Amino acid sequence: MSLVPQRSAPPPPSSSANRAASSLAFQPASTSNSASPTSSSTSTFANGSSSSTTAYRPQPTINTSVSALQGPRSGLPAQTGLAFSVSSLSNNPPAASPITAPSSALPWSSQNPAASGSTATFPPRPVRSNTAGPDTLHTISSVSASQTVAPVMVQRSHSSIAAHQASPSLNQSSPTLDADGPASLTTQSHFVHPSRDRERSRDGTTTPGSRNTFKSVFGGFVNSMSDVFSAQKKIEISTPYDPVHLTHVGFNSDTGEFTGLPKEWQQLLQESGISRQDQEANPQAVIDIVAFYQDATQSQGGSDVWKKMGAAKGNKAPATPRTDTSSEDGIYRVAPQPVLYEKPRTAPAPPGITHPNRPSEFGSPDLRQPPSNASTSSADTALRPSRSTPAPGAAPPPNAKTTSSSNPPPCKPSPASRAPDAPAAVSAASKNAKGPGSVPRRRETKKSTIKDSEVIAKLQAICTDADPTKLYRSLQKIGQGASGGVFTAYQVGTNVSVAIKQMNLEQQPKKDLIINEILVMKESRHRNIVNFIDSFLFKGDLWVVMEYMEGGSLTDVVTCNIMTEGQIAAVSREVLEGLRHLHQHGVIHRDIKSDNVLLSLQGDIKLTDFGFCAQIGESQAKRTTMVGTPYWMAPEVVTRKEYGPKVDIWSLGIMCIEMVEGEPPYLNENPLRALYLIATNGTPKINNPENLSNTFKDFLTTSLDVDAERRPDALGMLAHPFLKRSESLRTLTPLIKAAREQTRKS
């Protein structure tokens, strides 16, 4: 037996007929010196179902003898179970006297074992004729506190009950107050079957008179389910506590010096070509780009970014040759080992000064070099011809032979006999790097946290389980990287030419980028995106098969030819179409540049190299990670702000300058100073802008807007009037052939 406090609803009013029908009651065992509040007690039996209700109204202090509730009493027949009533209600009431009534008036006596301390006993089951009808409802009379009334008891239908089984539970309700008088006392002895527990309301009280119908059962189920789900509260995550700020870099405007700047950063600024005046003019930009540099050198993917920028050159003159040690290992880009297998690409320089070219990187894959010359190509030490910006509508030279005699050849790759010069240049750069003026050594790249077993499992899930050597024939190597080689091959049965990139997974530092690129390529089917064909995991090597773009990359075209505005517009339109498709599917490319735009001999233009692309969703509409090639980076990326797909629009604008001038802005600057100029100069300036049409200049200004909010998206840029001047893509064919011809001569 348990006492569970519950809140009971106010008793419903009862008619006088109901009160007359139930005139037999008994006095409870509890004694009190004052009026007691309303209370209810319920006893539930496991076997059987019956209920009886005894109601009390506000009344003076009731004092009854405890012996009246114990065993057979004088004046009452033994084991009759007849109730007794209180003869008067006063401060000193007389002892309870029995009420003469037929023995069939009540089926048993209501005793309070808890009050008497004895075990409750019950009479045999009453006959059916002496029980109340099935339609009899609980009735509780409503009277004032000053009236004298006997408790009212109404019987509900009874079923089988164990004669001497104790009640498994006793619920004591909480008191209620009557609006018109003192507290009322209502006690219920409610014997119910366990199934009637469904009739309880949500707050735990019993609703007398409610029927065990489908509605009540369903309501109880809904209430119980709502209680279950409401109990599952959302986990609260606390804010960080006890944070420790170890390094804080500030700027003292009085002294014009930075405070708290580590020595390595101070040396880096001194060697980067950022003057003291620059630091005083834009202290916040300096702090941003130094922090950017630090993040890049310590992050997992930072090594590729800075390798793309080339080795730092200290405080060298702007015309100092840029030694590129690019070794980006995208899926379809070969990471060159030293300088071999790199395409020559030089920056403009004054006449008479020779320097190594800016080598372009292998695309997706680098199919710019014919197979016969792939293993003999080397860095070019020849002079990069000075070029003037073409006037609008000027036709480009179809090949090297038609170039004006007043200008040097547009592109002169070095022959194979000049190959030893490249190692010499690399050796010289290595010696210079050991000097006191070199940039501090970069921290070693941390190993990827992803386990090899996880990579293998993911690759096996997305790769075809077959032997690629039986599906492709005549593999011919056209390039070699740190992690594998690039081959051309023919598909067995169809004789279709394909490009295959082989990668040794053990030598691949960023395996997660491999998986990312394969997934993006498989899901991005578009005429302006390089078509992914298949992938294989064969003998520990990953084979990625894609369509063969025999025209090479756009880098070959811009370094060896002068493009017209119509051709630039055509290339920009095709790139924007590919970007629109990616952005609509929640993908940011993040590395748009001429090296990642491949061409076919018919002039088809397709994007490649999705190793740095990012998937964005509703919960991550902006990103802050630093990836891409810094010379093509938007200011919001350099300054480590949140960015979105519009960073690709900025990179497209830089690529347009690349198509005009042959190289991106700040290419010959120290890498750190280049970042400083991107962050502070805003829209880069173009040489000889008077040679460009107003429409083209507006296109550049719009795409290179420093404010990312004002910068249009890919769809908005496609509506620009400049793209209406696009020429046919077939006009690019002569430029592609000219670049390939120069490559063969090398």
From Swiss-Prot:
* Native organism: Mycosarcoma maydis
UniProt name for this protein: Serine/threonine-protein kinase SMU1
Write out the GO cellular component annotations. cytoplasm; nucleus
UniProt xrefs under CDD domains: CRIB_PAK_like, STKc_PAK
Q: From the UniProt record, list the reaction(s) this protein catalyses.
A: L-seryl-[protein] + ATP = O-phospho-L-seryl-[protein] + ADP + H(+); L-threonyl-[protein] + ATP = O-phospho-L-threonyl-[protein] + ADP + H(+)
Tell me the protein family, please: Belongs to the protein kinase superfamily. STE Ser/Thr protein kinase family. STE20 subfamily.
Keywords on record: ATP-binding, Cytoplasm, Kinase, Nucleotide-binding, Nucleus, Pheromone response, Serine/threonine-protein kinase, Transferase
Outline the extent of the Protein kinase domain: 472-723
UniProt-annotated catalytic positions: 591 (proton acceptor)
The kind of enzyme this is, by top-level EC class, is: transferase
What residue spans carry the Polar residues bias annotation?
106-121, 128-138, 156-176, 370-380
Provide the CRIB domain boundaries: 237-250
Q: Which compartments is it annotated to reside in?
A: Cytoplasm; Nucleus
From the UniProt record, list the coiled-coil ranges: none
The biased composition feature labelled Low complexity covers 15-54, 85-105, 414-430
